[in-house]
Amino acid sequence: MKETIQTDWIKSEAFNLENCCNDNPLNILGPHFFKGKWVTRVWMPEADEVNITFKDKTYKTTTPNHKWMFEAILHEDPKNNYQINVLRGGVSHSQQDPWAFKDEWMGEVDRHLFAEGNHHHIWKKMGAHISEDINQKGVMFCIWAPNAKSISIIGDINSWDGRHHPMQKRLGGVWELFMPILKEGDVYKYEIRTQQGHIYEKADPYGFLHEVRPQNGSIISKLNNFNWEDSSWITSRDSSSQINKPISVYEMHLGSWMHDSTDNKYIEKNGNPRHPVPAADLKPGTRFLTYPELTEKLIPYVKERGFTHIELMPISEHPFDGSWGYQVTGWYAPTSRYGTPNEFKEFINKCHAEGIGVILDWVPGHFPKDKHGLAFFDGCHLYEHGDPRIGEHKEWGTLIFNYSRNEVRNFLVANLIYWFEEFHIDGIRVDAVASMLYRDYLRPEGEWIPNENGGNENLEAVKFLQQANHVLFQHFPGALSIAEESTTWPMVTEPTNVGGLGFNLKWNMGWMHDMLDYFEIDPWFRQFHQNSVTFSITYNYTENFMLALSHDEVVHGKSHLLHKMPGDDWKKFANTRALLTYMWTHPGKKTIFMGMEFGQRQEWNVWDDLQWELLEYEPHKGIRNLIDDLNKLYKNEPSLWKNDFDPYGFQWIDCDDTSNSVISFMRRENESNEWLVVIANFTPNFHESYKIGVPLEGYYKEIFNSDGSKYGGSNKGNMGGKDTLKYNIHNYENALEIALPPLSVSIFKHQLKK
């Protein structure tokens, strides 16, 4: 009777395996002790014959319970030390048995930390991990999907048939399977059968590499096989706060900076040409540059311009070029459009060797609905909120993370640490923070849910951001964490232990909008809008601000920076030079978007590359020269960066000359007596003898003039500098009487000796 029950149970389990409804295959497969012997069962769909080899002896199998369940009796526990010999369709092969590996990969401590949301290195357990142990070669798969009915690994190895390799469900909703015959480079997905019987094919949320779009499978990839050479850079970076140093950022999109011809293929190290990844149909016959080509071309370019950092728009894997990378499906993988993870690591390695930091745009606020992604991952709203009033951005067509779920927060926080630890990045810019902080963001009345206190704040998102920043600075004290936050949410750059969000920099969106609005006005009417220029100083010390002229301001009909400016071409260039120079002298760190450094004329288009041909023309060369010299001056003059976040570092001389649209101020730092005088003329009028007060008598050297001929200006200036004269103005007893060029910014430095 007992044997009949046992047989019926085995047949039932086999039936469930065949129909992808078994969440506990180890309960029946592999070696099992029964009546003093070891019954070893192998699941091998569509095999014609299976034999087992153990200790040089071959055991024939039978199929008493199911045509695909092959059984043999062994006289001792084979553990995982046996081979299965498979004949299928006239082709034979030998391998280890996936279900011989019964030990848990993710242990109790790992599960506990993950369930708490505190496993900061969860990527070392989740995903696909290659084992090169001589006794256990293969790949361990691990995925979190607590609501799934069953999960299988699918790929070329099993003709994408989920009946072949069912995974074992462990505690905490974690599923595991060791597959001996898979190797680096193999493509896989998870076939997830839901409780409702639906089948989803999902890419690995923790995958380290994915196929080039439009394909979306995950690729087995090694992680720890790169030889870093930047230890001194990392040590120096983490030894002190970076925000008290000069920071000048070149924001860019790798796929649209520069293209090459598809006929000009990238040659691999082994001499073989790499299949080109077409950039777009907009310019047929063009392809993306690879990470190695960007290493060769981009890094010297950025170094020559004098920027301290490169900011990359999202390079995490994403299916749609038109999302600019902001709709991520592969959170733990640099996009394969440009190459491999190791090639991207080499790009960062070389950046550090050339003294350039790397900042990544990070998008923890939302994710797309693509079927292979996180949406409805295991048949339930696992990563997102179920209620669209809190779980969906309808305007963007994306879903919002459920920050109240520990495992979801863990997925994101660990992802943040992953990029710093595995790829040695130096900073992040968190996109669309305002959309995370407010439940009613872009939502009409009645389409959002108040929080537990009746307010519109997303308290769970606040806690997540605080946790992410706290953990980041615990691990990497020299990191940059930059918030793109467009509202007046308080204490964005205050530490979490005093209630702040914990970022150390925030984009100054108010300054950006005010300045662009101001410079778009005809200069003759700017006298009525002087407050747009001066207002930013009134709140400058409420946060640690970064001034940014970003990609968002040069798309969707807004024009590129040069073409925002009024007037003829000469005035457009002069206005652009004046704005950039004023930006470099205003308190706050700096970020500009690619193309601004030479006066790009066309709007940025993600499917095109920059207008490099413009550099054949002198005015565009002039803008580039201006940026080169501004960055050099900026790094060499501590007054321009050392006290960015201290009121001591800035003092108005005169901000009330509205009739002339002229402002003047001082920049200084508290460790020396050196300081700079900055004077800006935002009209086309040339003032031959303009007086401003200064605190010290003596000689003031003109160290920068945006109207210089080198920059494409009229070259009106002050013959290298000016001596003070005794004249009471602006509450000072000394004055400079200077030539003030049209649409320009001039910088003077007090000299102890001429």
UniProtKB/Swiss-Prot annotation:
The keyword Transport does not apply. Pathway: Glycan biosynthesis; glycogen biosynthesis. It comes from the Bacteria. The active site is at residues 431, 484. One of its GO terms (molecular function) is hydrolase activity, hydrolyzing O-glycosyl compounds. It is an enzyme of class 2 (transferase). One of its GO terms (biological process) is glycogen biosynthetic process. This is 1,4-alpha-glucan branching enzyme GlgB. It comes from Prochlorococcus marinus (strain MIT 9515). The gene is glgB.
